[in-house]
Amino acid sequence: MKRVYTLLLFVALIFSLTACSKNLVKGSIVSQSNDTMAQLDIMPQKLFEFAEIGDIVVVIAGDFKEEMPLVDELIAEEGKLQLFYDSNEHSLSICSYNQNFFETYNVSPDAKVEINKK
């Protein structure tokens, strides 16, 4: 019986540690059909359970680590690297917005992507 309580305590501890983690979502680049967009296989809906448009997030993709705002079309700023939410496509991309087009950071297709709210 003591082992059961110990096991339950251990499971509760692990759960509480992961529940308090600021890690939002993990994924990888799944398609980069052209140089304008790199879509991530992470669900924006899952991201928005934790972060909102305008929040600063830390994006880690392979060796790349950058702090950037989570933006949509309305608040994208020219020349700044941003985590961009496309409401039409319901996709996320890491990009720099310049004169109505995206310049996407070159991320390896097999790179794991981790997004943390700052």
Predicted feature locations:
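Long, compositionally biased stretches
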Residues: 21-96, 102-117
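Hydrophobic helical h-region of N-terminal Sec-dependent signal peptides
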Residues: 6-14
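Positively charged n-region of N-terminal signal peptides that target proteins for export
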Residues: 1-4
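C-terminal motif of bacterial Sec signal peptides marking the signal peptidase cleavage site
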Residues: 17-19
